[in-house]
Amino acid sequence: MFARRLLCSAMIAAGLAAAAHADARDLMVVGFGGGFQDNARKHLFQGYTRANGAAVKDDVYNGEMAKIVAMVKARDVTWDVVMVEAPELVRGCEDGTFEKLDWNVINRSKFVGGGTVACGAGAVGWGVTLFYDQKRIADGPKNYAELWDTKKFPGKRSFRYTPKTTLEIALMADGVPFHDVYKVLATKAGQDRAFTALDRIKGDIVWWRSGAQPLQFVASGEVAYAVGFVGRTARAAGEGAAYPLLWPTLLYSFDYWAVVKGSPNTAEAMKLINYMTEPAPLLALAQDWAVSPATKAVADDPAVRARNPGMVANHAEVGLSISTEFWVEYGEDLEKRFNAWAAR
């Protein structure tokens, strides 16, 4: 009897150990790709491994929440830390897609104002602006109203395939001042106005879904004008491309690091986020890539600011801050309407 119990206990222990081993995996960080992630891999992900011994892998997505929601509902979470835009973060925090962050592990005091929310720690500031190739077009549109003038400025235009930023741009093109955009867009009449404005140039629109595409489209001549990520445009300009940074067309926000609800690596993920938002690794990253960090000591560093002409914080006063509150409230309905409109 004793031997049988001993054998049974050993089998249970072995089974538990095997299950634990099956559940154990490397940390998985998922971001938006591009030059930032290439350099984050070296300085943040691999830096964490060097400092703490935990292996970190990374992958890329385009911001779609459906996959994250599905893995949470299925309780089969294969992503641990994700870079998320602000409205999606807040909605995901409210509906249980993301974990509340542990501020005993993550030092909340190191961030700029607005750099943290319950489920997110600020990663980087980002923005989009209008640009074009001055080697092909010496004098292009300087604002969104001019971008809508297809007679004066013929050619294809490229926008990100999303209602966020696209609807704001449409209203500004239609004459709505920056400071009134969200007041107007919060009304049915304002939403109709934005889609009507888009109707006027729909035949000239080429949509992009990854951050590299607008640069590729403009470089190849497939489109004449594009609204693309500031960091990528500034980087291309620094490497010799004749792309102007038209700051009066700036729309900007923060991306955040979040932990997927149900991650088996939740505790380690909190430590990773704290590391990735520390000044030292971010300053090292800034040596290789122009960043707009949400960590105050880095954002305020004169050398970082001088090295990054595309730092959105330097130009926020002339741009439009993308309203997280607006997109949390109206985003789901406008996404459905936008997708239906684009498919027609």
PLM regions and their residue ranges:
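A bilobed periplasmic-binding-protein/Venus flytrap-type ligand-binding module shared by bacterial periplasmic
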Residues: 129-136, 171-173, 254-268, 284, ...
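Conserved C-terminal helix/tail region of periplasmic/extracytoplasmic solute-binding proteins
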Residues: 316-344
